[in-house]
Structure formats: C-alpha cells, structure tokens
Amino acid sequence: MKHIRNFSIIAHIDHGKSTLSDRLIQVCGGLSDREMDAQVLDSMDLERERGITIKAQSVTLEYKAKNGETYQLNFIDTPGHVDFSYEVSRSLAACEGALLVVDAGQGVEAQTLANCYTALDMNLDVVPILNKIDLPQADPERVAAEIEDIVGIDAMNAVRCSAKTGVGIDEVLEVIVEQIPPPEGDPEAPLQALIIDSWFDSYLGVVSLVRIKNGVLKKGDKFKVMSTGQNHTADRVGIFTPKQTDKTELKTGEVGFVIAGIKEIHGAPVGDTLTLAKHGAEKPLPGFKKVKPQVYAGVFPISTDEYENFRDALNKLSLNDASLFFEPESSSALGFGFRIGYLGLLHMEIIQERLEREYDLDLITTAPTVVYEVLLTSGETVYVDNPADLPAINNIEEMREPIVEANILVPKEYLGNVITLCIEKRGTQVNMVYHGNQVAVTYHLPMAEVVMDFFDRLKSTSRGYASLEYNFIRFDPADMVRLDILINGDRVDALAMIIHRSNIRHRGLALVEKMKELIPRQMFDIAIQAAVGSQIIARSTVKALRKDVTAKCYGGDVSRKKKLLNKQKEGKKRMKQVGNVEVPQEAFLAVLKLNE
C-alpha cells in the first residue's frame, strides 16, 4: 500500500491538464506509441471538438522511481470548466493529493483557485506545477510569486515543465512520489468502496469506477450497494491503463472498475458505497454533496413518437452525469417532454449535444430559467422554475430571485470594462483586492443575469483574460414579472419568460419584432403581442397574403371594385375566426438567441 499514489490534476481551462496526462501515460508506458494520440483521455467526440474535458477519467500507471522502487500511480484527469466543478470534487474525494497545474504564461485564474480551495478543504496535499515553460511569454518567477500571493501555497520550488515538449516530466513524477502521501486504510477491515463514477455500456450493463478505502474486492465476490441494499456479483474487476485491463482483485487504496452486470440504470448511484454482502461494513462512507441544478429548461422531442427513446436516453445519461435532474412536463405548444435541470449554460449545451449525437434525437429547448422563490398572499412559499407555473399576479406577495456571489479575476487594464458589465447586470460590488497585475473582484449578481450570457460577455470585454467562478448564496426580493407572448390573442406557454420589470419594454419589443420575421404569412392577419398580466406592452402584425381580386376589372365603375374588395374582406374575417397559427421551431429558438 505504501507504493500507491492517488492524485488528481486540477487546473483552469487550457492550462494543459490533458496534455500533461498524455505525457505521464507515455513516460510510464501505459500505451504503445501506435495507440498514443493527443488528449488520449478526452474520449468523447465532443470533448475533442471543443478541446475541453467534460468527464473525469482515471488511469493506473506503473512508475519505477529513481530510488529503484516501483510505484502504482492512480490519477484522475478532471475538467477545468466552472460548470463541471462537481466532477472535480468527486475526483478529489478519491485522492490523497492534487497537482495544481498553472500555465506559466497566463498565471493564476479564478477556476484554478476555486478547485484548489476545494482540494485544500478536503485536506489534500496540493503540489504546484508550472506548465508551458517552452512558450516565449512564459514567466515562471512571476507566476510562482502569484501562486504564493493568491493561493497561499509554497511555490518557489515548484516543478517547471512543458507537457508539450516533454521537458521536466520526470521531475513531475518524482514530486508525485515524494510529496503525495500514500493512501490510508485497513486491508483487514470490511470492504468499503466509494463509487466515483459510473456509466452504462450496452453489453456490460453498468460499469462503476470505485476507490477502495478499506478491505479488498475480489473477482466473483458478492457485494451490496449500501443505499439500495441490492446484492450483485462482481463479474470483472480491473484497472484502466488507459485500456480496460482485468485483474483478480482490487486492493485497499486502489482505484479501478467493477462490472457486475447491473442492468437497471440507477443500480449503482455515484457517491454510494459498496460493501460485501456477508460481513459488510456498518455504515457507508461520506459521499458527495448532491449538486443542485441552477438552470432549468423544457426540452421536447420534435416528433412525439420519440418520447420513449428520449426518456431512456435521459436515464442512461443521468447515470453518467450525476448532476442531471429531470421530470416530465407537457406544453400545449410543444407536446410532451421533460423539464431538465443543469448546472449552467455550457452544461446545458453539452447535454443537449450529447443527447442529439449519442442517442440520435431531434430536440427543441425552451428558454432557460432559474429557480425563483415566491411568497404567496396566503403566506406560503413556493419555488418556481417554469414561467408557466408562476401563480397569478394578484396571489403573489413577493418574488425573490437567486443571487450568486461571483469571484472574478481580471488583469487591471480590463477592470473598467468588467465593472461596467457587472453594473449593467444589476450587480453590487462586495470586495476588490489587487494582487500584482491581477485584480480579484467579488460581486453579488442575480443568477438569471449570470446564466444568460454573462460568461461570454465577460470574456469578450476582457479579451479572454478575465475568469469567473460563482456560487449561489441567497434569495433576494426583486421586481420580477412574467412576460407572455400572445399570438392572435392566445398565450403560447413555451414562449413565456420571467424577467425584471426594468427590462420588459425593451425585451417585449425585441421579441415581437423577431417573431414577426419568423412566423410565415398566412391568409389572414396575425397579431403578435407581448403582455405582462393583462397589460399589452408591444405588438406587431404579420400582414395577410391576399389575392389581387380587382385584377380583372378594367375601367368601369369604382363600386364594382369595392364590391370585390369587401367580399374578400368578409372572407378574411371568417377565416381569422377559425384559422390556427403554426408557430415554427425557429421562433422558439429565437427567444433563446434574443440576448445576442
């Protein structure tokens, strides 16, 4: 056991985590040169295309250290994006140490800090590593000082390496062996294994990634899942080297996979504990805190017969992505679908893309909303995440919107732009600290403003240098109203949105204009209105198509033309009473794009 090292790699987006993992795998000979390709752990197509890590992946390597001993290194590559921070905290729970990778050109960023604090809270040893020293703009001295100043860990003797060129990789491995403590645990005690991750394989059933805290799990053992109390037999156990490699047993302190032919999807929930069916452990390990979704959106299959497939797909995906929340929802405009809760907009985009790609579905999403706390006149408090469920205005005593605390790190030359943006988003400044060239600003912002397009705007006003990390703190009273869109006097539930009263004129006008472009002309006039309660605040009309009925009249009396025109008018009037308007898919998507 004293030769096992479990560690994670944490860093901000694009500081080189995945490339560093590639080098470690190569140096330790986990894969032959033929099988090696760039970012070998980012196995999802989506991860490769966007160049980001979404799922944490684990690898076990053998490393022969300079002192002649052979060590088993289990490491987990984690995502750097703020929406996936729960993936990071899960990975950290399985480790004794973490490598904090910092780009020697960019320096410390908000996400580096957030993940590093998570690691320190879990009492892990954090080892700083300066990456990308081959770049011309690299300045390791300044960055090391920055790490000490902002993060507060000793970084003067931090290893300097370049994952791309392979310089300093051996030193990184030595540091891992020297500075990260071996796992603690009792091989004789009853088995306790923490499920770090699980995914569904159509041939093998549920595959779970586990970290053995105490005891040993052998192939063929009968084990039980502590939260459900169900018993299963371990058909295969093993490790990833990154290839799936079978072993006869997983010992204390190791990280590996278990396949038990569990067919029902929630058979082994993430964060659960496995123990042996006979002589099992008394109590489960402390799991992870359940992540609360921050953003909700209705998602509907374009053709209704795909509803069942959509439900299966969501079930399979939620096994792999523990933070996904969904419940059935129906809409008069879009039929049956699900209300899905996400951690943020990137998460929402990724989930939708994964559903469309991996499960071949055609989906349409309504505008995302956050959860509001509503105090009713009857004195009870309800939580609303769907604009259609908002009680009538006269029943509402007070609306409260969620407020987040946003920590922004920005170079001082862009500070002005960032402050302007935060004020425009109804933020209040709480704190500002200068660290050398960087400024750390803390703002309290309404979550609704943050989830919409705050991140993109922040990046564009600061040329990509500002970085953001936020978490929910409380609900604050706010003057929020529901904006409805009426088409020919009928409310379209899928287009409703909850916004701040100061934005309704501007938003309502923009919306009806956009809808006017997108709804095709019919044989009769279509009135598109934006309303708050019974008050109409904006309107536009899609003009009717009409046949030129007077074309056959040459000369003659004007009453002849009038007769024909009036006859046409009567017909249009009758048509309007019975006519239905089809709202095209693009119109729903336009609502999402409005803020661009």
From Swiss-Prot:
EC number: 3.6.5.n1
GO terms, molecular function: GTP binding; GTPase activity; guanosine tetraphosphate binding; ribosome binding; translation elongation factor activity
Membrane-topology annotation of the record: Peripheral membrane protein
InterPro entries, alphabetized: EF-4 (IPR006297), EFG_III/V (IPR035647), EFG_V-like (IPR000640), EFTu-like_2 (IPR004161), G_TR_CS (IPR031157), LepA_C_sf (IPR038363), LepA_CTD (IPR013842), LepA_IV (IPR035654)
Binding-site positions, GTP: 14-19, 131-134
Recorded superkingdom: Bacteria
One Pfam family this sequence matches: EFG_C
Record's keyword annotation contains S-adenosyl-L-methionine: no
Catalytic activity: GTP + H2O = GDP + phosphate + H(+)
Keyword terms: Cell inner membrane, Cell membrane, GTP-binding, Hydrolase, Membrane, Nucleotide-binding, Protein biosynthesis
Any one cellular-component term (Gene Ontology): plasma membrane
Boundaries of every tr-type G domain copy: 2-184
PROSITE patterns registered for this protein in UniProt: G_TR_1 (PS00301), G_TR_2 (PS51722)
Group of enzyme by EC: hydrolase
Localization annotation: Cell inner membrane
HAMAP family: LepA (MF_00071)
Family, similarity comment: Belongs to the TRAFAC class translation factor GTPase superfamily. Classic translation factor GTPase family. LepA subfamily.
Xref: PANTHER family: TRANSLATION FACTOR GUF1 HOMOLOG, CHLOROPLASTIC (PTHR43512:SF4), TRANSLATION FACTOR GUF1-RELATED (PTHR43512)
Protein function: Required for accurate and efficient protein synthesis under certain stress conditions. May act as a fidelity factor of the translation reaction, by catalyzing a one-codon backward translocation of tRNAs on improperly translocated ribosomes. Back-translocation proceeds from a post-translocation (POST) complex to a pre-translocation (PRE) complex, thus giving elongation factor G a second chance to translocate the tRNAs correctly. Binds to ribosomes in a GTP-dependent manner.
UniProt-recorded name of the protein: Elongation factor 4
Organism: Shewanella sp. (strain MR-4)
